[in-house]
Regions:
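Short aromatic-cysteine micro-motif
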Residues: 55-57, 79-164, 185-205, 276
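Hydrophobic alpha-helical segments, especially N-terminal targeting/anchoring helices
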Residues: 51, 205-208
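Mature N-terminal segment immediately following signal peptide/propeptide cleavage
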Residues: 57-69
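Alpha-helical phosphate/pyrophosphate-handling elements in metalloenzyme active cores
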Residues: 180
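Feature responds to low-complexity, polar/acidic, surface-exposed segments characteristic
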Residues: 116-122, 171-173, 224
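Bacterial Sec-dependent N-terminal signal peptides
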Residues: 20-51
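Surface-exposed recognition segments
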Residues: 76-89, 164-165, 187-190, 211-276
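Sec-dependent bacterial lipoprotein signal peptides
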Residues: 1-25
C-alpha cells in the first residue's frame, strides 16, 4: 500500500525492511506564564489567536464548524485506495496552527532542536516522532495554560481544503503546486522557512509539502457512512500523517494523500502542526 513513499524517499535498507517501506527517513518562569495567558485570553472565541512562549509568537487560525466531503473527491486524480471512499464529515469549531511548528518554537519550549535541517530557525521542526510531539505539546500546555493538541485527521483535511471557504483545489490553496508547496521539484532537497509560499483560503501555510504533519488518529481505513467529529480507530499500532513533504512528488502532496508510521519513529521530512 505504501510503495508510493518508498519510491519517493531515500531509505536506509535495514530500517526500510523493519518498517515495511514506510516513508520516514531515519526518517519559562511563572511571570512568563502570566504574560502568555493574559496575551491570548484577550482574544475572543471565533477570532484567530496569538500566543507567545519565551519570546516566540505563533498564531492559531479559527476554523468555523462545517460539513465537507472527506477523501478523494473528483478533483483528486491519481488517488490511492486508502483515500476512498469519500464520505461526509461534520466538524465543530476548532483552531489550527497558521504554520507548521517551527524550530524556533520547538526550541523555546524544549530547549533543544532535533532537526536535520537546522540552518534557519523559521524552518519547520523535523526529526520528531509522534511521541516526541506529545511531549512537546504537554510542555507547551504547561507554559501557556492552554489545551494544544495534534489535529484529528478530519480536522487536518478540512483546514487543508480551506474550511467553509474551500475552492476545491487539488493542493492546499491552489491547483498550481509551485504556488503553495515545497516539494521534490522545487525544494532543493531541504525544508524551507514557513510562510514563503501562498496561504490557502483560511490563511494557513504549507499544508501541502515542506514536512509531513502528524495527526492524532490511529491509522485506519475510511467508511462510507457520514461521521461527526471523528477521531479515528480506538486502538492501533501506527499514527496518521498528512500533507507531503519537501521530498514528495506532486501527486503525493495532494490534500487527500495520507499515510502512517509507528509513533516512535522520526524522520527528516516529518513535523507537526498544532490544533485546539
Amino acid at each position: 500500500m505504501f510503495h508510493r513513499f518508498s519510491k519517493s524517499i531515500l531509505f536506509a535498507p535495514l530500517l526500510s525492511l523493519l518498517l515495511g517501506g514506510i516513508f520516514l527517513v531515519s526518517c519559562g518562569d511563572d511571570d512568563d506564564n502570566e504574560d502568555v495567558q493574559s496575551y491570548s485570553s484577550k482574544q475572543k472565541d471565533g477570532q484567530n489567536k496569538d500566543y507567545t512562549v519565551n519570546g516566540v509568537t505563533f498564531k492559531m487560525i479559527y476554523v468555523k464548524s462545517g460539513t465537507f466531503i472527506m477523501g478523494a473527491t473528483s478533483e483528486q486524480t491519481g488517488a490511492y485506495s486508502d483515500e476512498l471512499p469519500a464520505h461526509s464529515v461534520t466538524l465543530g469549531n476548532y483552531y489550527i496552527g497558521e504554520t507548521e511548528v517551527t524550530q524556533e518554537l520547538w526550541t523555546a519550549v524544549m530547549g533543544s532542536n532535533p532537526s536535520r535541517f537546522s540552518g534557519n530557525m523559521q524552518c519547520p521542526v523535523e526529526m520528531v516522532s509522534w511521541n516526541d510531539c506529545q511531549t512537546f505539546i504537554s510542555k507547551l500546555n504547561e507554559l501557556t495554560r492552554a489545551t494544544f493538541r495534534l489535529p484529528t485527521e478530519a480536522q487536518w483535511e478540512f483546514a487543508a481544503r480551506g474550511g467553509n471557504n474551500s475552492q476545491g483545489y487539488i493542493y492546499s490553496g491552489s491547483n498550481t503546486i509551485d504556488d503553495v508547496a515545497w516539494y521534490a521539484s522545487n525544494s532543493s532537497s531541504t525544508t524551507h522557512p514557513v510562510k514563503m509560499k501562498a496561504p490557502n483560503e483560511l490563511g494557513i501555510y504549507d499544508m501541502s509539502g515542506n514536512v509531513w504533519e502528524w495527526c492524532s488518529d490511529w491509522w485506519g481505513g475510511y467508511t462510507s457512512s457520514a461521521q461527526t467529529d471523528p477521531t479515528g480507530p480506538n486502538t492501533g499500532s501506527r499514527r496518521v500523517f498528512r500533507g507531503g513533504s519537501w521530498y514528495s512528488i506532486a501527486t503525493h502532496s495532494r490534500i487527500t494523500i495520507r499515510d502512517n508510521c509507528a509513533p516512535s519513529i522520526s524522520g527528516k521530512n516529518a513535523g507537526l502542526r498544532l490544533a485546539q
